[in-house]
Regions:
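Membrane-anchoring alpha-helices and their flanking helix-loop junctions
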Residues: 2-185, 210-268
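Active-site-proximal inter-transmembrane loops
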Residues: 178-206
């Protein structure tokens, strides 16, 4: 049986000889550690842990607050419900990436700050509309919100989140939060599962998830705004992304594009 000092053993880390108490040479193991997992880097374990803790606390606190506020008849339950939904979404973005696309999991995979200022402004606008209508224009909420609209909105949120997360899982290493500009060796054209029904199921899922969040909280202005802005955003993004996908996969992608639609209304 080979032992630690066997020169024929290929170790996953460098071994340097040091002396034991008897003066004999033994192998000292110094693990090769990815420097990006240290604090301040893109895969910082400490930062990942803090993000998960923060999202978990926020999700738990806001879920409890939503239930208590709703049962007590306070309209502001919509604000805590919206924040709870966002907390779960951002956690699942990282978790799904870490589980099915491990090599590409980074702190930025939470998408908390990497989606740009427009993304943050959209959420801030939704929160402001909730606060303003809850305290100053409650009649608007009563006009557009009831048990049926809330249930419909929640159905859109759950469906959208499920489709997006499953799409990320099925794409595996071929999924990127930022569209790839060059083809990697492990990048393959995924056409099975959800991808046999939608060309971009993660976009389809997020489109209806985002609109659903506004239906739940009865945000009339943001609901219409989200619908319009996201439609133009995904139309433009899909157009540019597919130009690169045609370069990567040629006729295979052209054929796939002819067979399968996006599922997003009026985006073929």
């Amino acid at each position: 049986m080979a032992h630690q000092g066997d020169p024929n053993i290929s170790l996953p880390f460098p071994a340097s000889p040091v002396a034991n108490n008897n003066g004999a040479a033994i192998a000292s193991r110094s693990p090769l550690v990815d420097p990006t997992i240290y604090p301040g880097n893109s895969r910082s374990i400490s930062s990942i842990a803090l993000h998960a803790l923060g999202l978990g606390i926020t999700l738990s606190a806001c879920t409890i607050a939503t239930i208590q506020l709703a049962l007590s008849g306070y309209r502001i339950w919509r604000l805590t419900e919206f924040i709870a939904t966002l907390s779960l979404f951002h956690f699942l973005e990282f978790w799904t990436t870490a589980r099915y696309n491990t090599a590409n999991a980074k702190v930025s995979s939470y998408l908390l700050t990497s989606n740009g200022s427009a993304y943050l402004i959209a959420h801030l606008a939704a929160m402001i509309e909730i606060i303003v209508t809850s305290f100053y224009f409650p009649g608007l909420q009563d006009r557009y919100s009831n048990a049926y609209t809330i249930a419909f909105g929640l159905a859109l949120v759950v469906m959208g989140q499920a489709i997006r997360s499953i799409a990320m899982a099925q794409a595996g290493v071929s999924f990127n939060h930022i569209p790839a500009k060059s083809k990697k060796n492990d990048h393959v054209l995924v056409t099975e599962g959800l991808y046999s029904h939608f060309r971009h199921p993660s976009y389809f899922g997020y489109f209806f998830f985002a609109v659903g969040t506004q239906v739940v909280v009865a945000n009339k202005i943001c609901c219409v705004s989200y619908l319009i802005i996201l439609w133009f955003f995904f139309k433009d993004r899909i157009n540019h992304e597919e130009q690169d996908l045609v370069k990567f996969f040629g006729d295979d992608y052209r054929s796939y594009r002819q067979r399968v639609g996006t599922g997003i209304p009026f985006i073929p």
